[in-house]
UniProtKB/Swiss-Prot annotation:
Chain's role: Can cross-link actin filaments into both network and bundle structures. May modulate changes in actin filament integrity and induce lamellipodia formation. May function as an adapter molecule that links other proteins, such as SRC and PKC to the actin cytoskeleton.
Modification N-acetylmethionine occurs at: 1
Ranges of biased composition (kind: Polar residues): 678-687
Modified residues (Phosphothreonine): 676
Protein localization: Cytoplasm, Cytoskeleton, Stress fiber
Taxonomy of the source species: Eukaryota, Metazoa, Chordata, Craniata, Vertebrata
Tissue: Widely expressed with highest levels in brain.
PTMs per UniProt: Phosphorylated on tyrosine residues.
Main location: cytoplasm
Protein name according to UniProt: Actin filament-associated protein 1
Annotated organism of origin: Rattus norvegicus
Stretches with biased composition (Basic and acidic residues): 271-284, 721-731
Subunit (UniProt): Monomer and homomultimer. Interacts via its C-terminus with F-actin; probably involving AFAP1 multimers. Interacts with activated SRC SH3-SH2 domains. Interacts via its PH 1 domain with PRKCA, PRKCB and PRKCI.
Length: 731
């Protein structure tokens, strides 16, 4: 029995150095009391009885006195505070004191007016500043004091968090490692909110006549600010110090732009705030303005501070909340100004839209738009007064792909560093944004040369096609503001960064061969280009660099006929060659088929008949395939011939009907047309506006010209012949 008592006493002493819950501590206190009672009653009786028995039998040997048992720690006589029978009042407020080894958690409890804690800024009374408010410290032994939540915490307290409409809610705020954990209750095992402190800026807003709380505003890029209320200036400084120490202990590289500055731990002076806000444009509600590392209050909050309040009564709390809700509801009814309106409805290729943006390892949907070579991210389409971030695009690099989970993702890099990670909703949207960003960054990269690792071939082809068309359109709009822009059917024309717009078409083979510059009436050569000063003005106005690859370009408006005709003639010649090759191949296949049929008749009933029949089937399949190719080729050739005739008649784009200067209205062969073009005065690469021939779209030529009376070749005739040929082969 004595051995059990000794071991039990040692066990209770060991428990004094451990973290225990309230239930275990109560059981330990009960066991300690029982042990003390047993030692005081039975222990001494057994000792006296043994001493009397020994004195009667033998002389008593010298005995060592028992060591005194140190009295273990006992709770005070007052005992733990009783648990409340009803729910805690609304103004009940607890602050957890930082723990030290071997101590139970202590909480500072204050009761405030529950009406003032409702839904406004008015809660803390003025007694606190004057030193009238008293804090009562007690040890919290009820079940709410969960030791697992505050274990290894640098600081913890019950703080008030400001909600969206100005209301306040009590949270248990704990800083562990480099994170701020907020629990709705100390009984919860999972935090309601987890905020990494790396990259955050924190501001202490002191209490004044309007603000009844000492506030800490924690702002992180891309998220709403977190506003916490503390009890005093000393507590605010303590939290600022702990947050700074927690951030300085972060492992890994730290971005100097996002690191909390030393001045963040110093309270901001009210006079300095007013001075800064008067010189700066105020930001949106809830967003702070960061200057020199110190986050200042927004303009609307400061304006509220300056306005003298008509009444300080507590009954105005509900009115203030009602006004806030009315303002928020009326935000959508306000007409945006011309600066805020996006031009997506007026542009053929909108440079704005919703994208998913990766920020702090979380995807958020943001309204993105491109303006003045900057990518501007807004929180919502309706809120264009303020922006979350503005990224200059000049000098950036566009790289598609991130991982297999997000195949429609593309990134912006500057000097190898990741600037933004964006995700589109579809392949067309991704191609459109890649084309826009390539044009705005001034990149010379072909969208087809980029690596699309996480999408299939069909989707990547769609992305590339859309990106090329968007890139071409953006560069056309940047170079020329002419309303008569050509269509985008030709796709991506110049990946070198210079747009192929209405008046710029490269010469055939990049240069004019075997042609001399035209001479004027006085024998002097005509200038082929405008003066260099005018050219520089055009280039500076367009904002596009001229490279050597497209240096030899001439004005399309004056030589539209030649440019279209040469392109169509080369295509017609290519189609005629393919048609001739198909004819020869078909003739060869028919001859082989005829020989095979004769061989099958000769070898009827022999073993070789099966092999010959298989070969005949293959030949017939190839014949059908070649026939289909020939029909499609005939149709394409007919379209090219019609387009060539329209080009010689003045071009379909401007709606002109100018006949070629040949003196005949009959259909011409490609060779004769080519000779006509060579001898015509419009075939020169003259780009002078004053000394060259009149352009084809001038009013003088339009008045003199007459509509062409020649009839185009009948397209239906070719289709009829093709059908007859198919019916003939089918029978």
């Amino acid at each position: 029995m004595e051995e059990l008592i000794v071991e039990l006493r040692l066990f209770l002493e060991l428990l004094d150095h451990e973290y225990l819950t309230s239930t275990v501590r109560e059981k330990k206190a009960v066991l300690t009391n029982i042990l003390l009672r047993m030692q005081s009653s039975k222990g001494f009786e057994v000792k006296d009885h043994a001493q009397k028995a020994e004195t009667n039998n033998l002389p008593a040997p010298p005995q060592m006195p028992l060591p005194e048992i140190p009295q273990p720690w006992l709770p005070p006589d007052s005992g733990p505070p009783p648990l409340p029978t009803s729910s805690l009042p609304e103004g009940y407020y607890e602050e957890a004191v930082p723990l030290s080894p071997g101590k139970a958690p202590e909480y500072i409890t204050s009761n405030y007016d529950s009406e003032a804690m409702g839904s406004s800024y008015e809660s803390y009374d003025e007694e606190e500043e004057d030193g009238k408010g008293k804090k009562t410290q007690h040890q919290c032994h009820h079940e709410e004091a969960s030791m697992d939540l505050v274990k290894d915490a640098k600081i913890c307290a019950f703080l008030l968090r400001k909600k969206r409409f100005g209301q306040w809610t009590k949270l248990l705020c704990v800083i562990k490692d480099t994170k701020l954990l907020c629990y709705k209750s100390s009984k919860d095992q999972q935090p309601q909110m987890e905020l990494p402190l790396q990259g955050c800026s924190i501001t202490y807003i002191p209490r004044d006549s309007k603000k009844k709380k000492h506030e800490l505003k924690i702002t992180q890029q891309g998220t709403d600010p977190l506003v916490l209320a503390v009890q005093s200036k000393e507590q605010a400084e303590q939290w600022l110090k702990v947050i700074k120490e927690a951030y300085s202990g972060c492992s890994g590289p730290v971005d100097p732009e996002c690191s909390p500055p030393p001045s963040a731990s110093v309270p901001v002076n009210k006079a300095e705030l007013e001075k800064k806000l008067s010189s700066e444009r105020p930001s949106s509600d809830g967003e702070g303005v960061v200057e020199n590392g110190v986050t200042t209050c927004n303009g609307k909050e400061q304006a509220k501070r300056k306005k003298p309040s008509k009444s300080e009564a507590k009954g105005t709390v509900s009115k203030v909340t009602g006004k806030k809700i009315t303002k928020i509801i009326g935000l959508g009814k306000k007409k945006p100004s011309t600066d805020e309106q996006t031009s997506s409805a007026e542009e053929d290729v909108p440079t704005c839209g919703y994208l998913n943006v990766l920020s702090n390892s979380r995807w958020r949907e943001r309204w993105c738009r491109v303006k003045d070579s900057k990518l501007i991210l807004h929180k919502d389409r309706a809120d264009l007064k303020t922006h979350i971030v503005s990224i200059p695009l000049r000098g950036c690099e566009v790289i598609p792909g991130l991982d297999s989970k997000h195949p429609l993702t593309f990134r912006l890099l500057r000097n190898g560093q990741e600037v933004a990670v964006l995700e589109a909703s579809s392949s067309e949207d991704m191609g459109r944004w890649i084309g826009i960003l390539l044009a705005e960054t001034g990149s010379s990269t072909d969208p087809g040369a980029l690596h699309y690792d996480y999408i299939d071939v069909e989707m990547s082809a769609n992305v590339i096609q859309t990106a090329k068309q968007t890139f071409c359109f953006m560069n056309r709009r940047a170079v020329s503001t002419s309303p008569y822009l050509g269509s985008l059917s030709n796709g991506y024309a110049h990946p070198s960064g210079t747009a192929l717009h209405y008046d710029d078409v490269p010469c055939v083979n990049g240069s004019l061969k075997n042609k001399k510059p035209p001479a004027s009436s006085n024998g002097l050569p005509v200038k082929g280009r405008a003066p260099s000063s005018q050219q520089k003005k055009v280039e500076s106005a367009g904002g596009v660099k001229r490279t050597a690859s497209n240096a030899e370009q001439y004005k399309y408006g004056k030589n539209r006929v030649e440019a279209d005709a040469k392109r169509l003639q080369s295509k017609e010649e290519e189609l005629l060659k393919r048609k001739e090759a198909l004819r020869n191949r078909l003739a060869q296949l028919r001859k082989e088929r005829k020989d095979l049929r004769a061989a099958i008749e000769v070898n009827a009933g022999r073993k070789t008949q099966v092999a010959l029949e298989d070969k005949l089937k293959r030949l017939e399949e190839e014949c059908k395939q070649r026939e289909a190719e020939r029909v499609s080729l005939e149709l394409e050739l007919t379209e090219v011939k019609e387009s060539l005739k329209k080009a010689l008649a003045g071009g379909v784009t401007l709606g002109l009907a100018i006949e070629p200067k040949s003196g005949t209205s009959s259909p011409q062969s490609p060779v004769f047309r080519h000779r006509t073009l060579e001898n015509s005065p419009i075939s020169s690469c003259d780009t002078s506006d004053a000394e060259g021939p009149l352009p084809v779209n001038s009013a003088a030529v339009l008045k003199k010209s007459q509509p062409s009376s020649s009839s185009s070749p009948c397209r239906g005739h070719v289709l009829q012949k093709a059908r007859e040929w198919e019916l003939k082969n089918g029978t």
